[in-house]
Amino acid sequence: MRFGEKQLTRWMELVRTYDDGIEAFWPSQIKSKTWICNELEFKEHFRSCVIFGSWYGVLADMLDFPEITCVDKEAKYLEWCAQKYPIWQGCISNYEYNDVPDVVINTITEHVSQEVYDKWFEKIPVGAYYVIQGNNDFSHKDHVRACEDLNMFASINHMDHG
């Protein structure tokens, strides 16, 4: 995880440009993005990454991969991401991989129905490392798959090790 003056200046431009840009920097958002970066820190051989639920691309900015594709359903977010990264707009279950990325990241598991998630999960290419992230915040109106605990999270996200 590396960023300097140029990146910090760009993030401040994001906050000034978009009314909801500051939300990408809430403490819980930074904590979850930092966790992903720390988990992937020693995967030096990774070069390519697809981020589902890329939002404004802050996680992409924090990762140190030369090839990152940002995926989101909202054009507004992708307009910002497109300044630095290849983008794809649409429902995550409709995404088609052209190549096998080294890592697939889904940070929006709580925002999609089980049907959409299952279809998306089935498409993860064999050999791709994947990171799945969600939360237990049932109060947000868009959280349709928040989880009570890690056991529930593992079960509905196909992370069972049985």
Model features per residue range: what roles?
Residues 44-56:
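Conserved class I S-adenosyl-L-methionine
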Residues 101-115:
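A short SAM/SAH-binding and catalytic strip from SAM-dependent methyltransferases
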Residues 67-72:
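Conserved SAM-binding motif I beta-strand of class I
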Residues 113-162:
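C-terminal substrate-binding/active-site "lid" region of AdoMet-derived donor-dependent transferases
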Residues 52-54, 106-110, 133-136:
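Structural motif
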Residues 56-65:
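Conserved SAM-binding loop of SAM-dependent methyltransferases across substrates and taxa
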Residues 1-44, 73-99:
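S-adenosyl-L-methionine
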